[in-house]
Amino acid sequence: SCGKATTRMEVKIDSPDPQNVAGEIICKGANLMLGYYKNAEATSQIIDVNGWLHTGDLATMDTEGYVTVRGRSKNMLLTASGQNIYPEEIESKLNNMPYVSESLIVLQNDKLVALIYPDFDDAFAHGMEQSDIEKVMEDNRNELNLQLPAYCQITKVKIHFEEFEKTAKKSIKRFMYQEVKG
């Protein structure tokens, strides 16, 4: 959980079942922005006619008002069976596993694939070779899958040999990796 909303602010989850089904976080209050300066079109895309600010973040909220962020709406993956996958949740777990520097979960042929940029410096410092790194990543995949529901399980790991391209804010440019084939 990332906590509760501050006083003087209303927060809702735009979902038919906010406790169990993630929806977009929307908020309203005197302490929020009024819009984008001299850009009515951009403002109308995030602030609706009722004054609710649409954050683009997906979350659930418990009965006490605690919000748990699941990911970004633009990053959500939708499987052919209709399951919503929040890649950030899986990546967060994967990034804490041995020798993983950073990762990206993508959908390929309706299967979840982990693109992993290993911590090569650490692995090589421990005397590992490429084949050892590949084995560790496969072990990580198996361990991770024990923690995930069946519909979220990773079917394959692909080693990425360079850091993922980033935005100015140091976020991975996901769109560059979504259509990876093979």
Language-model region placement:
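Short, hydrophobic beta-strand segments
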Residues: N75-L77, A114-D122, H160-F164
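C-terminal boundary motif of the adenylate-forming
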Residues: D14, L58, N96-F120, N145
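Conserved ATP-binding/catalytic segment of the ANL
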Residues: D17-N20, E24-T79
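Conserved C-terminal "lid"/linker of ANL adenylate-forming enzymes
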Residues: E102, D110, R141-G182
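Adenylate-forming
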Residues: L32, Y66-K93, D122-D132, L148-I154, ...
